[in-house]
């Protein structure tokens, strides 16, 4: 008994492995000093230490843990050390411009120094008394988003779009704009996506200046990756690692933070794998019975407090395009807005290719955004919807067969469609056009002028890839000359 106490005082609590099934490890510890749920266990292997997280206490002094890296080469009898704390990751300014894994270890072949500050990845959501309850618009400077599907400060946005329609460029522009307009930073969590995509994103961020190679502390983003080739434990926890880094910027640095999760479906998928490995009975469509709890634990920590905010943009993969699948259906319950990217618009060369009719937001209410913004947004949608209805007639009979009123609608809709495009700062290197940040007031003013018929005599090309309406008017003059 005395020996146990001494070991506990020294902080030593060793056990040994009794079973290894893939990424799941069972270990036996001395009676009375079992590791707590979510404690990190360290197992020595030939490849270096393997960190596991305690998930279940099985009785008979046995615990079941899930490994955060490959368990190749482990065998029964190997010593397991209880670290007596959950996984903790580095936080603060030193994380900017760096790439981390789920354990907060740098994986970008730069220096291992990432500052002294660390926080555990398992934390409580902010207390209700600390929350900012008044809904506020989070201005992005992107016309189509701010007008038709505005983001809530501290809200959660679902980003839907296939390959090659501009998700990455939109994400990088948002990272750039929050840094310039809000003095905020971003954290990108790559959850269970392709390693190639993670590498491409990193290279593009360096190219566009979002990551400053010469002075990393001037970078605007920290990257956390747990890619497809990682064990399910890492993919399930990497979202929490990214969120913990974001929480520090919000709570300690009192900044506005953008948290990107790509892809939230992979978080659910990893949880499903872990659940099966832990022997839980599957629920609907084979998902884990704890799906709602796991999703809630992550999403409830993403919020606005009186100190700062975390606004989260989550890429959502919809399996087999089935919106009733439990994974996307559970995600939708937490979202404040959806941004849908359209392949049709991308094919027309209209970037950002945000679908103005499919994208939605709970913020688009007169009481929140004001009457003028609401009416303008509704009129823009009505005009575009009418144009969509007329497209079949135009394709068969031609535009000349339309009534004068409908021709005017088509003319204005085409101008609106082009005016919804915008040159991005991060795309300057590809397009040669300088990026534009358009504030909400100028966005509303521009669309009101088009809808009111003040610009009916201007050519539609003048509205393509411009910032505010004054730029479109100036561009039209160059055509006339």
Curated annotation (Swiss-Prot):
Which superkingdom does the taxonomy of this entry point to? Eukaryota
Where in or outside the cell it occurs: the entry states: Plastid, Chloroplast thylakoid membrane
> Where is it predominantly found?
plastid
* CDD domains per UniProt: ATP-synt_F1_beta_C (cd18110), ATP-synt_F1_beta_N (cd18115), F1-ATPase_beta_CD (cd01133)
**Enzyme Commission code:** 7.1.2.2
Keyword DNA damage annotated: no
What's its membrane topology?
Answer: Peripheral membrane protein
Q: Which GO terms describe its molecular function?
A: ATP binding; ATP hydrolysis activity; proton-transporting ATP synthase activity, rotational mechanism
Question: At which positions is ATP bound?
Answer: 161-168
Matching entries from SMART domains are given as:
AAA (SM00382)
Task performed by this protein: Produces ATP from ADP in the presence of a proton gradient across the membrane. The catalytic sites are hosted primarily by the beta subunits.
Q: NCBIfam families per the record?
A: atpD
PANTHER family recorded for this chain? ATP SYNTHASE, ATP SYNTHASE SUBUNIT BETA, MITOCHONDRIAL
Q: How does it assemble?
A: F-type ATPases have 2 components, CF(1) - the catalytic core - and CF(0) - the membrane proton channel. CF(1) has five subunits: alpha(3), beta(3), gamma(1), delta(1), epsilon(1). CF(0) has four main subunits: a(1), b(1), b'(1) and c(9-12).
Its protein name is ATP synthase subunit beta, chloroplastic
The gene is atpB
């Amino acid at each position: 008994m005395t020996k146990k106490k001494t070991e506990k005082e020294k902080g030593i609590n060793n056990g040994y492995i009794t079973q290894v099934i893939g990424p799941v490890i069972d270990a036996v510890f001395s009676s009375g000093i079992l590791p707590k749920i979510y404690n990190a266990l360290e197992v020595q292997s030939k490849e270096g230490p393997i960190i596991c997280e305690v998930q279940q206490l099985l009785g008979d002094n046995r615990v079941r843990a899930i490994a955060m890296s490959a368990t190749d080469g482990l065998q029964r009898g190997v010593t397991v050390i209880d670290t007596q704390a959950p996984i903790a990751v580095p936080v603060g300014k030193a994380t900017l411009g760096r790439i981390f894994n789920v354990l907060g270890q740098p994986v970008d072949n730069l220096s291992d120094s990432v500052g002294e500050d660390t926080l555990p990845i398992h934390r409580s959501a902010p207390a209700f008394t600390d929350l900012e309850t008044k809904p506020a618009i989070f201005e992005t400077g992107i016309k189509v988003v701010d007008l038709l599907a505005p983001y809530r400060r501290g809200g959660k946005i679902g980003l839907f779009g296939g390959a090659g329609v501009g998700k990455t460029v939109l994400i990088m522009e948002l990272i750039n704009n929050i840094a310039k307009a809000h003095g905020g930073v971003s954290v990108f969590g790559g959850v269970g996506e392709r390693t190639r995509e993670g590498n491409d994103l990193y290279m593009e961020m360096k190219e566009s200046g979002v990551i400053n190679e010469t002075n990393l502390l001037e970078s605007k983003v920290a990257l956390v990756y747990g890619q497809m080739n990682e064990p399910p434990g890492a993919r399930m926890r990497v979202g929490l690692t990214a969120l913990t880094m974001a929480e520090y910027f919000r709570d300690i640095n009192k900044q506005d933070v953008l948290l990107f999760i790509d892809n939230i479906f992979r978080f659910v998928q990893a949880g499903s794998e872990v659940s099966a490995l832990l022997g839980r009975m599957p629920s609907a469509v084979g998902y884990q019975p704890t799906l709602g709890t796991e999703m809630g634990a992550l999403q409830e920590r993403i919020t606005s407090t009186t100190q700062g905010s975390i606004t989260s943009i989550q890429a959502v993969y919809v399996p087999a395009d089935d919106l009733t699948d439990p994974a996307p259906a559970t995600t939708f319950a937490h979202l404040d807005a959806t941004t849908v990217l359209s392949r049709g618009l991308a094919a027309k060369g209209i970037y950002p290719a945000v679908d103005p009719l499919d994208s939605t937001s709970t913020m688009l209410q007169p009481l929140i955004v004001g009457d003028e913004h609401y009416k303008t947004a509704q009129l823009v949608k009505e005009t575009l919807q009418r144009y969509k209805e007329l497209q079949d007639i135009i394709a068969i009979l031609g535009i000349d067969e339309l009534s004068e009123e409908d021709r005017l609608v088509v003319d204005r809709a085409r101008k609106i469609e082009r005016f919804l495009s915008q040159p991005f700062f991060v795309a300057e290197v590809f397009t040669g056009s300088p990026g534009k940040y358009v504030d909400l007031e100028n966005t509303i003013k521009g669309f009101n002028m088009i809808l009111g018929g003040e610009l009916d005599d201007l050519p539609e090309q003048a509205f393509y890839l411009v910032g505010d309406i004054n730029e479109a008017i100036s561009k039209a003059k160059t055509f006339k000359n």
